[in-house]
Amino acid sequence: MRDIEKYYDNTESEKSRNNVKYFVNKIKCHSGKAIELGCGAGNDTVYLIKNNWNVLAIDRESVEERIAKRLNNEELEKFRFQKQNFESLELEKNNLIVANYCLPFCNKNNFKELWNKINDSILKDGYFVGNFFGNNDEWKSTKEEMTFLTKEQVIELFKDFEIIEFKEVEKDGTTGLGKMKHWHIFNVIAKKK
């Protein structure tokens, strides 16, 4: 079994990420057009659809069936999938971008262009919910092509936004493949001005 398939199997039964639940339940945004980047097993996509969002889920792997089987017929009408990698990504206008544990995997040489596409796609009063890896993340020493940012760099990305939540987390924990690593993460919820 490929590692990516094992990752999807390991994470498919997980609930939506805390930042997405916080966004839906505390900020009280319950409908609109959302895009989930790097959707993986689709936990956030399914949660958003069940909370009345129309979601375009994007991943570089063919995960459409994994997600679709978790939705009823009415919910399927709110679901679209696009197989695409970050380098060729085209984004439609939206009210919400969810990008959990995916943007760091964009090649650092392409990150600025990707971020500009994300920023340009979010409508006024739309939201970004996602995270970035910091320079203290264990993978920085072994995965040179990935994108790692300082706190200041992350904040600078959101100059066109009002930052609603910003949490820096540094801890040891497991990956989706069950391996231990040191995490350094910046979690962000922001509203486009």
State each model region's role.
Residues F105:
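ABC ATPase nucleotide-binding domain "signature" loop
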